[in-house]
Amino acid sequence: MQHTHYLKLSKLLITGKLCYTTNDDIYHAMCNVHLNKSLMEQDIRVICQQISQLSWIKGISVRKQWPNVLKIYIIEYEPICYWNDVQMLDKDGVIFQVPIDRINDKYCLPILYGPEGSALDVLTGYRVLYDVIKSTGFTLRSVKMNHRYSWQIILKENIKLELGRKNKVERLQRFIKAYPFFIKNIQNDGRCINYIDLRYDYGFAVSWMTCSNYSDCENIE
């Protein structure tokens, strides 16, 4: 009669709020772990290290259940926005990546852009701008900070705003205040807004785009 101490591991029980993780992910991550060993011979530390290599895994709890079950509890990062199109950020500015075919576009997350190492700065800037705009009826679609610390945002209405390096909140507020009067006076002449440049002490400039992609610029005080 075989002693239970030597029974091979026969079951992995994987639980947690899993949006991106599949059972196959866990099995593949553990390919270097000798699953044909007994439960008591399994090294929990090594198992955690293997699974942690999955970019979207935030935390893992592994427990042994007698006589031959390994219980794995997974905590995933929760994205609040996309980062440079191909990655994601959580609320703490942690960058992670999920297989593209598992990303559900119905969440319509905003997209943030920035140089390497700037994720937390851009996320902080996004939150500041979001607080300004959240009660106005506009929606932030993307926020970008370039290597010169100059800010650009695109609204869900496909309006691009150049905010520049400083006073981005005041400049955004200027646009919000002027927009109802500005849009009211736009004639339906086949033109659409290319972008609005708010990098002025007063007023802003509007770049128009026509069907032939010709752009001209009009200053509005």
Q: Model regions: which residues?
A:
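Charged, solvent-exposed interaction patches on well-folded alpha/beta domains
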Residues: M1-L13, T21-L39, I44-Q49, Q53, ...
